[in-house]
Amino acid sequence: RDYYASRGLGDVYKRQTLVNAILAICKNSLSGIGGEIRPGIVHRLDKDTSGIIIVAKNDIAHINISNQIKERKVKKTYIALVRGNVPEEEATINMPIGRSTRDRKKMAVNKDGKPAITHFKVLKRYGKYTLLEVKIETGRTHQIRVHMAEIGYPIVGDAVYSNGKNEFGVEGQMLHAYKLEFEHPTTKKHMELIAPLPQYFKEILEKLY
């Protein structure tokens, strides 16, 4: 294999960084493109977003998958719990995202920003909350979080874009990178990798029934 698919490492290494967890598991069998800071890491997940991430074992695989991401050939699917009852069964958000003019540490919908496209579909409604399947065409920083907050349905637990509300006391936003689809860099086979929801996410959904 030319890559590792890390599923929920945060559950095992709660008090360590993703890099430490990867090094503990993979040792020296990693792509060197990212250097010591990001060994083998091909793409990113927002801080406190759970789920799957691809780590390349060699430079060829790293470059191949990076190119697939740039060409929008990698399909990313997320599961998100948002605040509010989303009326549409499915919809597309097409709003450019750039650095916030009010707070440079945050991102925001900005007419001068880069194109950002997010698709979502309702999986289940829980009164004041809605569970969504979210797919992104672009990979802007904080894209899903910014888009959902912009249309009035912020992600539960998002300390940055949800006005500080955290009604379930979760550590981070309830946004989970559920599935990745891409072409294997060597065999060219279609790959579909899934990371099940974390236990805390499942428990909160059970409470909402």
Q: Language-model features: where?
A:
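Helical mechanochemical/support elements of P-loop NTPase systems and associated helical scaffolds
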Residues: 14-18, 41, 61, 89, ...
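Internal amphipathic helical hairpin motif
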Residues: 17-33
